[in-house]
């Protein structure tokens, strides 16, 4: 299963490292990533493969939420099908 991880918040050092670190800890493969900084706001979208994730989805979401809280950023994990449906015109 694929998912989209979005990260939004005030730019700070180590955002990509911390999010990718959680991915590594949970055996989540990062397939694509894009990020930009708009007026000191950091925005990142990661496409990830959850097929080898080592924990249940609830635990995975909790781990990303915790990292987001410590960085004071919003981190969301959305299944790719849901993300695609939400952004289809």
Descriptions of predicted regions:
Residues 1-89:
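A conserved regulatory-domain signal marking ACT and ACT-like small-molecule sensing domains
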